[in-house]
Amino acid sequence: MSIVSISYNQEEYIREALDGFAAQRTEFPVEVIIADDASTDATPRIIGEYAARYPQLFRPILRQTNIGVHANFKDVLSAARGEYLALCEGDDYWTDPLKLSKQVKYLDRHPETTVCFHPVRVIYEDGAKDSEFPPLSWRRDLSVDALLARNFIQTNSVVYRRQPSYDDIPANVMPIDWYLHVRHAVGGEIAMLPETMAVYRRHAHGIWHSAYTDRRKFWETRGHGMAATLEAMLDLVHGHREREAIVGEVSAWVLREIGKTPGRQGRALLLKSIADHPRMTMLSLQHRWAQTPWRRFKRRLSTELSSLAALAYATRRRALEGRDGGYRETTSPPTGRGRNVRGSHA
């Protein structure tokens, strides 16, 4: 088993992550490969302490130059040697010392399963009430199709069957974990264990913090990476028309969100996303074209049904009023009784 982790300026959180790794009780060998991306705080020193304390467990990679999240993650994946891969970033942590044992036991018993995950507790540093992810409504469908539509697997909950190489992960893919989930899932099945065995933090220094606090900033900084992720996913589902259509639908949404960025910066970002990711853009357009006739039909149908309903209502009202001696289609004004009847059915 290879535990792969990345860190950058996480001195406040890294000990809990490392303690969670060291606490795992297993009957199989485990290695922890943690790559620090040239942190400027005490994170490298703390990692070094754990490597000295558990020399048979930790394989630290302490960079002197920052290479970025994508390159750091890709490199640590390539360094793994285990049959299985478990992911956990330096600001999250595990709470169950049997987490890995439970997941490996399941995978060993179900060779058709390539992705095994579990719910996580989400804690908020702004004081908001804790929650669980994925929400209950998302747990009903654990198919690859559902995973393409929305990422329901939290990074620090997942264990994969390791693939021979990760050198071909496309550049700029972000979120890389969503891409990895799909990459492993298309070769088998997805399973979720019921226990909540990890904690995911939402804090101001997190990579995805702006996704929840500042949507404009999120799409300005992460929109191109989202587009790159969807473009890369097309290689994973190539030839599967239904799944390509799902990617097209998500792509249409991503381009709409990028397009909402105001000013020249927004236009430039949208044009760059379109130019750099033509297949994703084409599928997005195909999705919109496919939706347009249906939307027209629905609008027309809605109008016609409304007209029929209005006609039926008017006919019924006239029949009732005629039966009660009320208003009839004449040039005479309605009587008092007619007004009462009309009022009671309006």
Curated annotation (Swiss-Prot):
TM spans (from-to): none
Q: Which GO terms describe its biological process?
A: biosynthetic process
Q: Name the segments for region: Disordered.
A: 322-346
Q: Which GO terms describe its cellular component?
A: peptidoglycan-based cell wall; plasma membrane
Query: A Gene Ontology MF term for this entry?
Result: glycosyltransferase activity
Residues folding into a coiled coil are none
Pfam families with a match to the protein in the record: Glycos_transf_2
Supply the name of the protein.
Uncharacterized protein Rv1520
